Amino acid sequence: AERVAEYQNDNSSLMNTALNVESIVYDSGFPLATKYALCGFISQRKDTFVALGTHEVGGLKLTASEDNSLAVALRTRLEFYPESDYFGTHVMRGMVVGRSGKIRSSQFQERVSPLYEVAVKAARYMGAGDGNWKAGKNFDGAPGSILDYIYDISVPYTSVTVRNRDWDAGLNWVQSYDLRSNFFPALKTVYNDDTSVLNSFLTALAICELNKIAERAWRYYSGVSYLTTGQLAVRIDNFIREAVNGKFDSRFVIEPETYYTDADKARGYSGTTKIKIYANNMFTVMTSYIQAFRMSDYSAT
């Protein structure tokens, strides 16, 4: 808790993103006080994400109601760190996962958060040495959403009423997929607008990476005086386009635009880069119904 508190200090050496390249911290089952402290991981740097679990290692199995109460508390703490006061953007670089289970084929017998599953699959999808997301390793939707490593889920069934309540609280849960398997119906951030693409865990992580790329572009061109403002804008945009080429498994359309505000022009030494990301919404709700006809009606068509 003491170490992670340094992320709230903008004078800490942890703000040196050239050397401290971490993007995400996973809650491995810390006590509540430490979970609260982990929320500060995203307080200063916009290239970071925190994934929290309701489970505490060594603690009792929680009920669905207890999971929900903890999720509300954790989401409230995360809301201390909005994305932008200027634009009024609420926090989205955080996620809360409920329930607990055991690790399959492991000597570690304590219960753990299903975040263990998320961490393993995220590393396999997004953790390559070249930084490119691996096609075929995504875990949004089956088969990737089906749990491979965690079993004996603490709350194996979540009713519709409870699911709606958990969703409103920003809580992710695990439920039955078939007779043998469980799955994540979705992995949503704590962002408070269900219609926004910022609800998606993967989209949020892409935005974290885009913030890293933008800072690398600044490091590359900082101090340049041999380019006109127009030439510099083109160079910065091309730098970003090259950096994102092939990175995100063809999931997004990304458009950088460097321009100069009136304040930039007056100063003469600054510019503004806007990076647009176009992403798909998560599919989470399906309405279905059955229509019955006479066979003769089919034959007639």
What function would you assign to each model-found segment?
Residues A1-L232, F239-Y260:
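A glycine- and small-residue-enriched flexible loop/hinge signal that marks low-structured segments
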